[in-house]
Amino acid sequence: MKKSTIWILGIIMGLSFLSLLYLQVSYIEEMVKMRKEQFNTSVRNALFQVSKDVEYDETQRWLLEDITEAERRALAQSSSTTEQKNGLIQQSERYRFKSPDGTLYSEFELKMITTEPSKVPKAMISERHGRNTIPQTSRSLTDAIKNRYMYQRFLLDDVALRMIYKASDKSIGERVNFKKLDNYLKSNFINNGVELLYHFSVIDKDGREVYRCSDYEDGGSEDSYTQPLFQNDPPAKMSIVKVHFPGKKDYIFDSVSFMIPSMIFTIVLLITFIFTIYIVFRQKKLTEMKNDFINNMTHEFKTPISTISLAAQMLKDPAVGKSPQMFQHISGVINDETKRLRFQVEKVLQMSMFDRQKATLKMKELDANELITGVINTFALKVERYNGKITSNLEATNPVIFADEMHITNVIFNLMDNAVKYKKPEEDLVLNVRTWNEPGKLMISIQDNGIGIKKENLKKVFDKFYRVHTGNLHDVKGFGLGLAYVKKIIQDHKGTIRAESELNVGTKFIIALPLLKND
């Protein structure tokens, strides 16, 4: 699959996941906003009803105290008699209706007859005397009730005016029963669906706090609500109740918490998708690097095979057989190229180490200074071939480590070989090897004056198959396994390695290995 196709699919899927995540976040934000508005509306409705309840309570208390039986009864019962005869009970009640000036307007008698078994009363009205008939008496009763209603209305208006006048002079503590106020708050909050812990306080017209509940906590204006207790009072004399909900945020969050798992699942899918795309690109890059490796490996094998083939053909020449010196020379070439080919095969076999968790190491006590000196003596001829020089500063006073001699030797050799491969064509190679001690560690540095490494490539030099060059041209011999092998061996020895480099200046590799014994 082409890289451009992977990018297009990745962008489409990524945008789809991001859009889905954005919609979920927007939906949660809208739900939180809606729940807040719903909560605010419910609380304000409850507080408004509390205000009405408090006003009603005060009005009822005033009416019970001030209204008296001031009006006269126009309809009064004058007498009552009871007779029992032949199993019947007869009750007679006589009523007189008087006009406002006190004169007798009409009189009638109400008789009720009850039989003992059924207890069902029977009533009839008998006219005794007066100027009016029963219909006229009924009209008189209606007028009297109407007059009584008007009187009571005027009486209530008078009481209300006096109540408002006197109430404005009383303190809020005298006007409100705080225990009842708490009950009103609780019942109205429940009626409006707000079943949440609340704290409240009462503030008088001067802004002083005259009451607060025992566990009151002021959580700021966002979670607090205020409501005038007596809305008809003048603004200068108005008292308010302040209610705070300490668990409001948790209450709002709990109402939308069912969406959180869905959003988390989407985020997990997005992360998994990103990781999958990363793996796809990494595998594609690894494939390209393997192809590059095959090209380089083919070139590395082609040269010794061609040389051996040519030498084998020369041996068929009868003239070669007659010249012992020529025969010995050709045999030496075949032997050298065979060793070279075997060495390349061994390097390819190093690939299998990267598929194992840990290499098989033959650990023993080593003097790192002596080991490095031996490698330098062997490698000096190759450096001199390029008109270079190699120096050493073996300053480590405690160079003893517990390591695999063969693998550590290969590590030093590979790092020196890299210095030769990446030397500047126009300058002579200068290679320096240094050792020193740090607490509990042996430090080894190998520094050259080669072409250097770009910063963006520096962190990749230890990757398998990675080689610092342009394109797939075989400009430097090797398979791209050397530094990956070096890093793995150092890590298997519980050490660390890092690279420091500057383009066109040189590269420095620093190795830290644990000492066998601390001084």
From Swiss-Prot:
Q: Which GO terms describe its molecular function?
A: ATP binding; phosphorelay response regulator activity; phosphorelay sensor kinase activity; protein kinase activator activity
> Which reaction is catalysed here?
ATP + protein L-histidine = ADP + protein N-phospho-L-histidine
Q: What is its EC number?
A: 2.7.13.3
Under SUPFAM superfamilies, the record lists: ATPase domain of HSP90 chaperone/DNA topoisomerase II/histidine kinase, Homodimeric domain of signal transducing histidine kinase
Q: Which residues carry this modification: Phosphohistidine?
A: 299
Task: Report the PROSITE patterns cross-referenced here.
Answer: HIS_KIN (PS50109)
Keyword terms, alphabetized? ATP-binding, Cell membrane, Kinase, Membrane, Nucleotide-binding, Phosphoprotein, Transferase, Transmembrane, Transmembrane helix, Two-component regulatory system
User: What is the documented function of this protein?
Assistant: Member of the two-component regulatory system RprX/RprY. May activate RprY by phosphorylation.
| UniProt name for this protein | Sensor protein RprX
Give the originating organism: Bacteroides fragilis (strain YCH46)
